[in-house]
Amino acid sequence: VKEIWKYGLNLSKTIIRFFPTFTLHDETHIENVCDWMNKLLGDKRNNLKAVEVALLLLAASCHDIGMSVSVQQEQELASNSETWEWREFFRTNPKDGAEFQKTGDLSDRMLRSFVRVNHHKRVAEQLNSKLWPSGLSQEGLDRETLIRLCQSHGEPLDHLRDSGYEEYDLGLCAVLL
């Protein structure tokens, strides 16, 4: 758990490079997320299974890593403006769509807005680039579960319904996140 938690923390600390006006996403931010989860749980925290606690800790650390954008990732995002994600972004942000149609350029503001709106989707890219510790999988905590939980941070809760998870309550974890 510690290895992936630190990976999430280290990526979260780099968010400030791409979003210089955002709150620092460092240990304090992650501790605050954990504190809120703890407060929301109240006495029910004693009923959590070990795998649920691990999922919550990892989600606290990794839920915003989609906002961590390396220079290479920034260039890739800017050069792929013909994807359905960009088309959807322009559809829901018509002023940006009109500006892009007019200039053919993605401004830094547009790129940041696109990443902010889609950061929950980018979690998969970030977590898939990290070797997953076999010990986590052996304990029933696989990468796809964490990705799904982190992505729920930006999706309706019903995306987790009928998920087939019987070992833990992924819906509860998502609500706490």
Model-derived regions, located:
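Divalent metal-dependent catalytic cores for phosphoryl transfer on phosphate-bearing substrates
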Residues: N46, V51-L177
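N-terminal, well-ordered alpha-helical segments
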Residues: E31, D35-N38, A54, L58
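C-terminal effector/catalytic modules and regulatory tails appended to multi-domain proteins
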Residues: V1-E3, L177
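Phosphate/oxyanion-binding active-site loops and adjacent basic polyanion-contact surfaces
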Residues: F22-W36, V115-V123
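Conserved helix-loop functional segments at active or binding sites
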Residues: K39-R45
